[in-house]
């Protein structure tokens, strides 16, 4: 398992830059979620690893943890096939898969940049990606690809047990990475 990038470790999480939201009456901000552990799950609707592993994991986290202590946020971050993964397609996907957690749509500033704004700010390598943000708003874990439920649960539990001012390492033990293909069973890389 790849650890949080050194440049991002324990830094304040960049605010989410979105063009819209689903499953929430108001746009969410990380500032409004201070005091909670934030689980940010990024995905694309045509990413096999997202559909098979990442999204079901986000649903399990949302079901198992107290929403007053843990906020699960999905971020639809499209870096390929933009014409078929717009808001309408996402709304159908969210309905069909019965996703209940809030989902932001990563803001895309056109083909010149290629990668959406939040994905770029977090230096993500592809989808699915998992980011854990502590109660003070700092990035504590950042990983491209699938992370086991046990490792994620361990990390969330460690963050929940911290006092607001503490910042200990919550990275679970390392395992092997993904293959070299752009899309495999773990996700789609840039």
Predicted regions located by residue number:
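Structural microenvironment flanking redox-active thiols in thiol-disulfide oxidoreductases
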Residues: 52-98, 108-117
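Proline-centered helix-kink/hinge sites
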Residues: 14, 48-49, 56, 102, ...
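Extracellular/periplasmic catalytic domains that process cell-envelope and extracellular macromolecules
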Residues: 32, 66-67, 96, 123-125
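Loop/turn elements at helix/coil->beta-strand transitions in domains of secreted/extracellular proteins
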Residues: 35-38, 68-71, 98-102, 135
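Non-globular targeting/processing and membrane-anchoring segments
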Residues: 1-34, 154-190
